[in-house]
Amino acid sequence: ATPHCGILRFTFPSNEQSRIQIDLARRVGGTSTVQYVKVVNENTIQGWMKCTPDGGGWGNGEGSADYTVYYYAQFSKPLSNYGFWSADIPDNWVRKRDEVVSIPYLTRVSQTPVITGKKELEGKHLGFFTEFPTTEGEEVEMKVGISFVDMEGAANNFKKEIASKNFDQVRQEANDLWNKELSRVQISGGTDEEKTVFY
């Protein structure tokens, strides 16, 4: 990761229909309450997720943060076969940490029909997927820039921090940054295992 971006690398088997799917509603400790996603070009999506206390969040699902996170995401494989879903989660259902992994909740999500033929969608409990053929061991990367200000900020962060980098470069730079910051701290005592846990 970088300060405002992240990169994921997926390794696939040989398959005519490999898939990456993103649950745009999920967040730490619960769900975002409304989402928007738009296909920008053959490799890119952008959008936002509104996160209110109603959807849970930090603090064991009892968080009180209220924010919108904007994203700009690019796939290394073209979005030639993609779609969306919009799960029918009743408004009176609790959307906090334990509930979003419950059987009734997951059942509703799994039974959601796929939506194709659109370039953008706004709603509650949205998801996005892209499918593509892969060869044995093929690596596919997804890079994402975020902003808590606007979509332009997410795209700018993406371009500035991660657009020209690959997974290994980003991982090495993140490792170097952590080592630089953690080298400021000197610890004494404890076992080697405890020092490793501290690090």
Q: Language-model segments: what does each one mean?
A:
Residues 1-199:
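Beta-sandwich/jelly-roll carbohydrate-recognition scaffolds of carbohydrate-active enzymes
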